[in-house]
Structures are given as C-alpha cells and as structure tokens.
C-alpha cells in the first residue's frame, strides 16, 4: 500500500537546491571564492601588475566601490600586501646584516628620493638645510657599506659564472640567423688585403673640446618615425621573444641590410657630397665605433671598410672624399652581446606606437649652442694667448685705455705714402695748425669750435678706416716685417723734435712704423714718474684754460658734434673690427683732446707725431727724443669726463671688454675663408653686443676653420623629391665640423615623443627624438647594473648627432626576459654621467684616425683594431697579387663569431644611486645588506604579512651561513638548503 501511494502521489522533497552553489554547497570553487587567501590566478595577476603603486592608492580604489562585502575587502587587502611585499630572492645568500636599522634605511631612502637629483645650490636645499646635511652625513656611512656589498656581488658573480653563459634556445636560434645574414654582407667587399700602414690609436697632440664636434647644417631628412611607448599596463613587462614573432617583426635579412647599408653606395650621400664637398662621409654606427675606444685597455675589436674617391669639381680642382662604411661583424662575441642582439628587436617593437610623423618635422637639434661661461672664458683666453702673444706680440692684459694717442703717422699701412693718404692727411694738418698758432690768451669763439668739431668728425672717420688697413697690413706682413719697422720707429721722432720749424706733414712722418700702436701699450708700463708728473701738469694747465673760455657755447657745439661723430663711427664700423676699438679710441681720443686744448698750445708749431705733441704740450725743448717720450702717457681718466668729445667711446670699450654672454649662436657657424663679408652699412652697430666678438678677425681662433660652409650653402634648401626615401624607417643627413674637417654623417631618429619646447614655453609642444638603449641585467635581484663605458659612449654619440634627444634605458632581466625597469635619462643627467668618460681623449683618437685617412691615396682600405691593442692596422686591397701575408677577409668571416676566452667573469657593478620600486616601498637602501628584523608588531606594520617572532641571537658566518630560512618571504634571502655549484 505504501508502494501504491508512492506511485500514485508525488514524492515529497524537503531538500532545497542551494542558491549559491551548483550541486554541492562546499565545492572547491566556492571555497576559493569565500576564502581570504588569494588564488593562483590573483597571485599571477599581482606578480605582473605595475610596480610602484602604494597601498594607499590600492585601498582608495577599493573604497570607491559601491557595495563590497567584508570577505572581498579582506581578499583585496591580502592581494595588495602580498604583491607589494614580495622581494626578489638573491642568487647567493647575504653574508650578514646591514649596520643600519630598518628605520634608518627608510629614512635614508626618503632623503635619497628627495635630494638625489637636486643640485646643492637649489631652493629645496636652502629651505631644508638640516635634512640635506643629514643626507650628506648618512651618505658617507652608506658608501662604506656599498663598497662591501659590491665586493659581495662580485664574489657572487664568480660563484654563479654559468649565469653569464646562459642563452635560451630561441635566443640562440634568432642570434644565429641575424649573424649569418650579417656575414653574407661581408662578401660584397674585396677578399684580399695587404698591410699598408700601422699607426697608433692615440694622437700626439691634445684636442680642445670647445673646438670639437659642431653641427653645421641638417641637410636632408627622409622617411618617417614612430612615437615611443613608455607606459605599459603591467610591470615587469614580458617581451615577445619566440622564434616565430621576431621574424614577423623584422626578418634577419632586413636587420643585416639596414646595419650594413654602405654610405659609399648611397645615392643621396653622393649628391650631397658633390654639392657640399665634405672631406669625410660616414655612418652613425662607424662614428660610434671610432669614438668607442677607451684607454688604456682598448678592449673593443672592430673592422671598418673605407673607400677613398676623387670627385671632379666643375671649375676647380678635384676633391678627395673618404667614405667610412659601417663596421663589419665582430670576430668574437660574448654571450652578453648575443643576448643584447636578441632582446633589441622585441624591445624596439614593444616600445613603439603605431602612429608616425615625417622625420623632417622632428625638433632634432637645439637652435643655439648653450656654452657655459667657464668654457667661453677659457676659450677666449686661450685664443688671445695663442694669437696675440706669440704672433702679434700684443699684451691684452695691459690697460690700453690709458693711452692718449698713437699719432697720426702710424695709420699708414705701408712705408711709402699713396696719393690718397697724402690728400687725406693734408686737411687734418690744416685744421690743427690754426689753433696751434693761436694766442693762448684768446678764447676761441663758438663758430671756430664748431668748425673744429666738424673737422674732428672727419678725423675720426679717416683714422678709423686707416686703422683697419693698418692691422690688416700688420697681420699680412708677419712678425719679421714688424721687427724691421721697430728698428726705424724712433728716427723720425728725433728729427721732428730737433727741427720744430719744419712743416707739420712730411714724408718722414708717413714712414713711421706701423707697430707703434702695439708697442706703445708696453712702453706705458716702463715710463718714469717724471714723465707722469709732467703729464699731470700739462693736463691741469689744459683744464684751467678750458675753464676760462666761453664754455656755454663751446661745450654745446662740441657735445653735439661728438655725438654725431660717435654715431658715424658706429654706423660705419663693422663687427670685424670690434676688438680693434681699443686702439681706435685711444687714437681718436688724442685728436679730440688736441682740438679742445688747442688754445693752450704754444706758438711753436706742433707735429702730428705723438712724441712731438707730448713735448710741445709739456713745454719741453729737448733736441733728442728718448723712448719714453715718444709715446704719450695718461695716468688718470678724469680728463675724459665732459671735455672729451669721444668719452662715450670709452664706455663702449668697457662694454666690449666684459665677458662674453652665455649664448653664442654664431660660434658654430663662423667662416673666415669662404664666406663673403657683408657691406659695412649692413653690419650691426651695437658695440656692446657680445655676439660680435666671435666674428672678429683679430684673434684668428675665433674664425671658422677652413672647410666650413659658405653662406650661400648655409641657406640652401634641398628638394626631397630629388632623393630616394627609405622604405622603412628614416635617414637624416647632417653636416658636422671637427676643427678644419667637414663630416657628412648619415644617421636616423629611433623614436620620438611630444613634450614642451622649453620650460618657459610649456604650451608649445614639439616632437623630440628619443633613443632607447636595451640593457640586459644579470643581477636584477640585487639592483640595477651601472652603465658601461660603451653604453655611455653610445648615449653620448646620440646626443652629438641629435642634441635635443632624450634617453631611455630598458633594463631587462636576463633570466626571465622581462622589462622590469624603464629608466629615463635627461640631458642634464647624461652630462653628469659623462664625467666618467675622457671625452678629450676620444675626440683625439677620432681626429687622429680621420687625419691619417686624409693622407691616403685613392682606393679601398680596411681599418682593423684588435682587442686590447693600442695600435691600428690599415690594410689596402691587393692589386691582383696575393701573397702568403695577405689578409683574407672572407675566410675570416666565414663562420659565426666565437666566444672570447676570459679568466674573469664579465661582471658589471651595480648603480647604488638608482632606486627600484621595491626599494622605495620597503625602505631599502640600494646596494646594502638587509637590515636586522624588528619585533613582530613592527614587522607586521611594515610588511603587511605575518612575520616570525623568534629573534636571531647567533652570529652569521660570512662564508657558510645565510640568514635564517624564516625570513625568506620578507627579506628576500635564499634558503640555507640551497647549494650553489
């Protein structure tokens, strides 16, 4: 019956299906969802999330959610803390604890973040001086531990030497394909070479950095360039390194063809060479190779093919052009270098956006060369010492403003007077004769003074033109002719004094030596006190006479005419004579003073010669003229206050003697040989403009060396339709000068970014070049490796090619192939890092090699440098004759490059100034040992996870023991069970 009821009626089911489960309530999925522990998926997401987000930011994002239960909040909190607390485990356990506590380490990290990149004279330092002093004091003690830690890292590298020989299968395969494609490019060069010459890498003459690599002009920019990508969804970022993805990005053949595209076969370079006639044409890669030679080891091995051609020039003699192609593959290559090649292409692809712009729109170079004041002052002083002291015997340290006049007779550039010069001096003599004969008791009237002032303006104009001819003749005549003239300079002086009744202008006056002006400054210093006293008396007499005259009418006329005279002088003088204003002013000043005190002169006729003028003014009747009396001397300046019509010119001279301003845009673009000087009326008339100094013809070191561009080529714009643009990437052709050498460099812009044009113009945004340097790290668990000399030289070379470049260094873990840090280096930071390089030595090597190539004849050559050798071998192609000593290039590069044998591990020290995100979060000083553990409460506050409560009392042995295994999670210390073989 029961069975009948069960079959007739529906069976009762008292079990309710779970709302929050599928079939079983406590399933594994529900347990994972309700558990406070993070799942494996969450841990994986946390490990790949962007490092640097602090706990406050994560907690804030959780609080903003509308409805979240307590379990989800706890899970999110655990997920955040676990992801941020994990520290990389060291390859070798730490031998000891740090001498700094956790609080001290966190303190120093905060100070390091605040003051690491702040200059000592900044406002931040001035406001918080106590903190900065504390930072400096702690830095001294930290550096001591950093030294010990680096020794520990070096020993760790020796224990883990196999790490530096590690290369994955994909990396090995991709690297082999790229190297084989590069070896195929070697076959296009001649096979046999014979040794032509052996020379030293280092030159024998020091190189001046301030006269170094300077941009003349950006000739041509072809192609497009992509934007750089610097923000990634998660860090560390995994690179796409499979053997299938890399050929899809860029095939090995394309990589090899781009690396070995010779400039000697470039049709664009051929057209530019025919127009601009540079002595040398080279690629950016060959320029870097020639600069990357660091003594005394010279460990870089390289081979560079060179092609020397003679190009005919219409209407001129043929010119010789040296083509320096890209370097050949290395004969031996380390595993680090192979790893670098393997990671370079994927990093380049990952840090590129899809958008691109024409490379011609990129703001590649600074519009002006910003030279520091110290460099400018050093350069100016050196130029003056070299040119004036040795060649012209002119001492710029002498105060030539004290000279009263140099005499009218010294203005003749040649010994024999020309008719033009005689006619010019004659009116000058007539003008000065009348006031000389006039009675001293009579005050001159206003019309006389006005007429005399008008003649004074003519005098200044004529003397200014003759001073130009004088200095030009002196520079052309040389020191020997000046010396011959010095022997005759006092003969006419004595004749004039003894024969005072002769006419004012004679042939002997015009034959006075040209260097009288130059040596008068030296004679001022050796003059006697009696002559100075006589000069003082004569000055006082002249001042008293002027006070008794009708000053109201006279001063107005003289002042107005002097102002007009000054304007005429400024308008008619070009900037090429700015340095000669010192001599011109003094001479012009003498005529101005003679015009003013003409009524005080005796009735005896006065000569235009400075010696006779001084004698007549001082009422001297000597029949002979000593050397000291042949030059006028003025010990004080108070005479020039109101009575000197050219007193304002002295102010102009003082402005010219001030240091040159910081910005000199004309300095890299000076030309003294090929450039055409503009007319005098077109030259700027402002004498205080500091930029006019480098254009002067007085110190020849200010002139542009030979081979620079003429003005017509500086303004020439190339038609891009006449040139062949690359299918991929871009080409930029630039013209640089290295002293007297002109270099055509073919380079490229790797990536670009948009940033403000300057600090003052933040609203104006332009595209600037960016260079990304991949760097493979072998001790990423301890910190970041410092830049090597070659890597610094690479960044420096890019800054030479594109002065507006910014730099990024992509630090890649060699074991995980992940980009764990993207370091940005500004131009200011790069300058600080470049102090480790001997830039003058690198320039010296480059200049020496280029000059050696300039001495070679037409043909094909091969530059060969062996590792750790200071000599350079120059091979020349064999002319059909093959000997046993011939160098077979194809046979040398027939196989893959080998691995160099070395007894030492290629360890690179870490950079203690570079903070990683885990350093900032945990308060760890870079390149120091872990601090001692605190109590459990403090540990849980700092780390956010459970920490062991047991303290460690036993001492730690440096050789055998590591830190206890309980601290592996928090401290990043390897377990003591691990054995390093």
From Swiss-Prot:
Superkingdom of source: Eukaryota
Keywords tagged on the record: Nucleus, Phosphoprotein, Transcription, Transcription regulation
Nucleus is among the record's keywords: yes
Entry-annotated residues carrying Phosphoserine: 17, 326, 573
PANTHER family xrefs: LITTLE ELONGATION COMPLEX SUBUNIT 2 (PTHR14633:SF3)
Organism: Bos taurus (Bovine)
Stretches the record annotates as Disordered: 406-427, 475-516, 591-627, 669-690, 930-981
Subcellular location, record wording: Nucleus
Protein name per the record: Little elongation complex subunit 2
């Amino acid at each position: 019956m029961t069975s009948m009821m069960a079959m007739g009626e529906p069976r009762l089911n008292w079990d309710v299906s779970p709302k929050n489960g599928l079939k079983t309530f406590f399933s594994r999925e529900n347990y994972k969802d309700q558990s406070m522990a993070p799942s494996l998926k969450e841990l994986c997401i946390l490990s790949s999330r962007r490092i640097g987000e602090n706990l406050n930011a994560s907690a804030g994002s959780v609080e903003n959610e509308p409805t979240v239960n307590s379990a989800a909040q706890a899970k999110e909190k655990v997920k955040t803390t676990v992801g941020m607390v994990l520290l990389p485990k060291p390859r070798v356990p730490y031998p000891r604890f740090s001498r700094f506590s956790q609080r001290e380490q966190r303190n120093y990290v905060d100070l390091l973040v605040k003051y690491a990149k702040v200059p000592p004279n900044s406002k931040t330092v001035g406001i918080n001086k106590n903190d900065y002093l504390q930072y400096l004091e702690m830095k001294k003690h930290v550096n001591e531990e950093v030294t010990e830690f680096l020794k520990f890292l070096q020993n760790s590298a020796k224990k883990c030497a196999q790490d530096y020989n590690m290369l994955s299968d994909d990396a090995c395969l991709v690297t082999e394909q790229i190297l084989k494609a590069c070896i195929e490019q070697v076959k296009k060069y001649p096979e046999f070479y014979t040794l032509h010459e052996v020379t030293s890498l280092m030159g024998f003459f020091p190189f001046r950095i301030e006269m170094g690599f300077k941009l003349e002009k950006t000739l041509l920019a072809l192609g497009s360039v992509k934007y750089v990508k610097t923000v990634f969804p998660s860090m560390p970022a995994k690179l796409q390194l499979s053997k299938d993805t890399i050929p899809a990005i860029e095939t090995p053949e394309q990589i090899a063809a781009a690396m070995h595209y010779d400039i000697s076969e470039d049709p664009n370079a051929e057209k530019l060479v025919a127009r601009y006639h540079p002595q040398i044409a080279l690629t950016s890669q060959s320029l870097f190779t020639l600069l990357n030679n660091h003594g005394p080891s010279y460990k870089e091995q390289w081979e560079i093919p060179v092609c020397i051609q003679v190009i005919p020039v219409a209407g001129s003699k043929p010119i010789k052009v040296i083509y320096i192609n890209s370097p050949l593959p290395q004969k031996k290559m380390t595993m680090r270098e192979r790893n670098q090649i393997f990671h370079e292409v994927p990093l380049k692809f990952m840090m590129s956006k899809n958008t691109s712009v024409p490379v011609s729109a990129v703001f590649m170079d600074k519009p002006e060369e910003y030279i520091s004041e110290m460099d400018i002052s050093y350069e100016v002083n050196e130029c003056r010492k070299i040119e004036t002291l040795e060649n012209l015997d002119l001492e710029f340290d002498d105060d030539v403003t004290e000279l009263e006049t140099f005499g009218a007779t010294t203005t003749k550039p040649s010994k024999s007077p020309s008719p033009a010069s005689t006619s010019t001096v004659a009116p000058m003599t007539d003008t000065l004769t009348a006031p000389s004969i006039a009675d001293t008791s009579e005050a001159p009237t206003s019309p006389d003074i006005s007429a005399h002032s008008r003649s004074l303006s003519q005098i200044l104009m004529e003397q200014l033109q003759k001073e130009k001819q004088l200095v030009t003749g002196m520079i052309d005549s040389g020191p020997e002719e000046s010396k011959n003239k010095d022997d005759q300079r006092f003969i006419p002086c004595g004749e004039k004094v003894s024969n005072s009744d002769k006419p004012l202008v004679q042939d002997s006056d015009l034959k006075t030596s040209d260097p009288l002006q130059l040596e008068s400054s030296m004679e001022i210093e050796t003059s006697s006190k009696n002559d100075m006293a006589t000069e003082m008396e004569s000055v006082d007499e002249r001042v008293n006479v002027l006070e008794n005259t009708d000053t109201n009418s006279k001063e107005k006329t003289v002042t107005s005419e002097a102002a007009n005279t000054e304007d005429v002088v400024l308008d008619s003088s070009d900037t090429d004579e700015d340095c000669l204003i010192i001599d011109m002013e003094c001479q012009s000043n003498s005529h101005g003073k003679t015009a003013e005190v003409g009524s005080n002169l005796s009735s005896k006729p006065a000569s235009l010669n400075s010696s006779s003028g001084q004698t007549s003014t001082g009422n001297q009747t000597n029949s002979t003229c000593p050397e000291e009396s042949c030059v006028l001397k003025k010990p004080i300046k108070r005479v020039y206050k109101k009575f000197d019509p050219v007193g304002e010119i002295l102010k102009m001279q003082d402005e010219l003697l001030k240091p040159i301003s910081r910005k000199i845009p004309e300095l890299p673009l000076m030309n003294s040989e090929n450039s055409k000087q503009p007319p005098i009326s077109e030259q700027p008339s402002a004498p205080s403009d500091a930029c006019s100094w480098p254009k002067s013809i007085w110190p020849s070191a200010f002139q542009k060396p030979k081979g620079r561009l003429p003005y017509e080529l500086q303004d020439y714009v190339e038609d891009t339709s006449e040139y062949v643009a690359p299918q991929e990437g871009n080409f930029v052709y630039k013209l640089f000068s290295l002293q007297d050498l002109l270099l055509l460099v073919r380079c490229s812009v790797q990536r670009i970014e948009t940033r403000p044009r300057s600090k003052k113009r933040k609203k104006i945004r332009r595209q600037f070049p960016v260079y990304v340097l991949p760097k493979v790290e072998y001790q990423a668990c301890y910190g970041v490796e410092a830049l090597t000399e070659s890597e610094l030289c690479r960044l420096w070379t890019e800054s030479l090619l594109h002065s507006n470049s910014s730099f990024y260094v992509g630090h890649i873990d060699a074991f995980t192939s992940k980009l764990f840090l993207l370091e940005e280096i500004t131009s200011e930071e790069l300058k600080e890092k470049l102090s480790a390089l001997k830039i003058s030595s690198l320039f010296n090597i480059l200049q020496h090699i280029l000059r050696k190539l300039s001495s070679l004849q037409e043909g094909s050559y091969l530059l060969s440098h062996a590792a750790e050798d200071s000599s350079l071998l120059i091979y020349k192609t064999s002319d059909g004759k093959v000997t046993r000593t011939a160098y077979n290039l194809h046979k040398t590069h027939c196989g893959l490059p080998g691995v160099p044998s070395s007894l030492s591990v290629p360890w690179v020290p870490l950079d203690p100034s570079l903070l990683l995100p885990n350093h900032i979060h945990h308060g760890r000083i870079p390149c120091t040992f872990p601090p001692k553990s605190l109590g459990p409460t403090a540990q849980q506050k700092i780390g956010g996870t459970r920490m062991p409560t047991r303290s460690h009392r036993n001492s730690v042995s440096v050789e055998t023991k590591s830190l206890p295994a309980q601290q592996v999670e928090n401290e990043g210390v390897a377990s003591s069970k691990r054995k390093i073989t």
